[in-house]
C-alpha cells in the first residue's frame, strides 16, 4: 500500500528530493560532511544559497528591481515585519480579509501600533468567497494593501486573473500556492512565503521586496533582525541562516525546474484539483465549500455536513494510507492539500476511498 500525505503544512515533498537528502545527509560529496554541519560562511553553502536565489528568480521571473531574502521566523514573523518596514508613512494598511491568515496579518499590524482597515471580509459565509476592492477604494489613504493569495485553511484563492487592481502598493502572503500557479511578480511590491507548504521543509521563509520602495522607508526604530535591508545587504546571512532548510529549498526549486517550471506545475495542479472537484461536485454526499471561481488548486476543502461522520471518515482514511485529511479545527470537514509534489495517483487513491466511504456511511 502506498501512503499519501495530504497535510497542509509541513506538506508533501518530491520523492527525488527526499532521496537526495537521505543520500547526502551524512556526507555530501562536495562538503565531505553532513549538510547540517557545514559553515554558513563556507564556499559550499555560498553556492547553495546563490543557486536557490537564482532558481527562484528564474522560476518566478523576478527582476533586479526586487531583492530576495531567506529569513527565519515563518509567515507569522512576516505579519509584523511587513508593516514595520513598509507602514511608516501613513501608519495604516488595508487588508482584504479572506481567511484566518489575512485576519492574523491585520491583527499583527495593530499589535505593533499600526492601523489596519478591513476593506472587505468574507467571514460572514465562513470565507467561502473572496472579498474584493470596492470602486471607491483610495490607495492614497494607506501605505499598502495586503492579501493572502491562497487561503490554506478555507481553500479560496486569488488567482492572477482575479487579483484586485490597485494603483497603490500591493503585498501578498503566498505561503501555500507559491510556484503552484503563475503570478506576475511585477504586480506586487512585496511577497513572502513560508517554505513548509510548497517550497520545502519548515525553517525558512522567502521574502521578495521591491528595492526602491524599501529605500523610501524610515526604519531607524525597527529592530535590526526585522529589517529587510539587513538581509539583502548581507545576502540573507545577517545572522546564521537555516542552512538545511535553504539546502532543501534549493533541491525543491531544482526539481520544479526539471518538471518544466511553474507553467508545468500549474497544468498538473489544474488536472489534480479538477479531478477531485469534479468528483465532489457530482456527489450528493460530499460538498466542496468554496465558490467555483475562487477554488484553490492546492487546498481542496469539503465536507459531508456531519461533523462526527467527517471525523470517522478521516480516521478510516489513515487505514487506507491517506494521511492528514482532516480539515482545520476552525472549519472541520476535510482538506486535501495537493501541492506541487503531490502525484495524480494520490488524487485517484483519495477518490477511490471517498467512494468507498460514501457507500459505508450514506
From Swiss-Prot:
Protein family per UniProt: Belongs to the class-V pyridoxal-phosphate-dependent aminotransferase family. SerC subfamily.
Organism: Leuconostoc mesenteroides subsp. mesenteroides (strain ATCC 8293 / DSM 20343 / BCRC 11652 / CCM 1803 / JCM 6124 / NCDO 523 / NBRC 100496 / NCIMB 8023 / NCTC 12954 / NRRL B-1118 / 37Y)
Pfam families with a match to the protein in the record: Aminotran_5
Subunit organization: Homodimer.
UniProt binding sites for L-glutamate: 41
Top-level enzyme category: transferase
InterPro entries xref list: Aminotrans_V_dom (IPR000192), Aminotrans_V_PyrdxlP_BS (IPR020578), Pser_aminoTfrase (IPR022278), PyrdxlP-dep_Trfase (IPR015424), PyrdxlP-dep_Trfase_major (IPR015421), PyrdxlP-dep_Trfase_small (IPR015422)
One GO process term, biological-process aspect: L-serine biosynthetic process
Function field: Catalyzes the reversible conversion of 3-phosphohydroxypyruvate to phosphoserine and of 3-hydroxy-2-oxo-4-phosphonooxybutanoate to phosphohydroxythreonine.
Designated name of the protein: Phosphoserine aminotransferase
Subcellular location: Cytoplasm
N6-(pyridoxal phosphate)lysine modification, residue list: 197
Cofactor: pyridoxal 5'-phosphate
Amino acid at each position: 500500500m502506498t501512503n499519501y500525505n495530504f497535510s497542509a503544512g509541513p506538506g508533501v515533498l518530491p520523492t527525488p528530493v527526499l532521496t537526495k537528502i537521505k543520500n547526502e545527509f551524512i556526507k555530501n560529496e562536495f562538503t565531505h560532511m553532513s549538510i547540517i554541519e557545514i559553515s554558513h560562511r563556507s564556499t559550499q553553502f555560498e553556492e547553495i544559497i546563490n543557486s536557490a536565489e537564482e532558481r527562484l528568480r528564474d522560476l518566478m521571473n523576478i527582476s533586479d528591481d526586487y531583492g530576495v531574502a531567506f529569513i527565519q521566523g515563518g509567515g507569522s514573523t512576516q505579519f509584523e515585519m511587513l508593516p514595520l518596514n513598509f507602514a511608516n508613512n501613513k501608519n495604516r494598511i488595508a487588508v482584504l480579509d479572506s481567511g484566518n491568515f489575512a485576519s492574523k496579518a491585520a491583527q499583527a499590524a495593530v499589535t505593533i501600533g499600526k492601523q489596519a482597515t478591513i476593506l472587505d471580509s468574507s467571514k460572514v459565509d465562513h470565507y467561502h468567497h473572496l472579498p474584493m476592492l470596492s470602486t471607491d477604494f483610495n490607495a492614497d489613504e494607506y501605505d499598502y494593501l495586503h492579501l493572502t493569495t491562497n487561503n490554506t485553511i478555507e481553500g479560496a484563492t486569488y488567482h492572477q486573473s482575479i487579483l484586485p487592481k490597485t494603483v497603490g502598493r500591493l503585498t501578498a502572503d503566498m505561503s501555500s500556492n507559491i510556484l503552484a500557479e503563475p503570478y506576475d511578480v511585477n504586480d506586487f511590491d512585496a511577497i513572502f512565503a513560508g517554505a513548509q507548504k510548497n517550497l520545502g521543509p519548515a525553517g525558512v521563509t522567502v521574502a521578495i521586496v521591491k528595492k526602491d520602495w524599501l529605500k523610501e522607508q524610515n526604519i531607524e526604530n525597527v529592530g535590526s533582525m526585522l529589517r529587510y535591508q539587513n538581509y539583502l545587504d548581507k545576502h540573507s546571512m545577517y545572522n546564521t541562516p537555516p542552512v538545511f532548510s535553504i539546502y532543501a529549498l534549493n533541491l525543491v526549486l531544482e526539481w520544479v525546474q526539471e518538471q518544466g517550471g511553474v507553467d508545468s506545475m500549474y497544468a498538473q495542479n489544474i488536472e489534480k484539483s479538477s479531478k477531485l472537484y469534479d468528483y465532489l461536485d457530482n456527489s450528493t454526499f460530499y460538498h466542496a465549500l468554496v465558490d467555483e471561481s475562487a477554488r484553490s488548486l492546492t487546498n481542496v476543502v469539503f465536507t459531508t455536513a456531519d461533523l462526527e461522520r467527517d471525523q470517522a471518515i478521516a480516521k478510516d482514511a489513515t487505514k487506507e494510507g491517506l494521511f492528514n485529511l482532516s480539515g482545520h479545527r476552525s472549519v472541520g470537514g476535510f482538506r486535501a492539500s495537493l501541492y506541487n509534489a503531490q502525484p495524480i495517483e494520490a488524487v485517484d487513491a483519495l477518490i477511490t476511498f471517498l467512494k468507498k466511504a460514501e457507500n459505508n456511511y450514506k
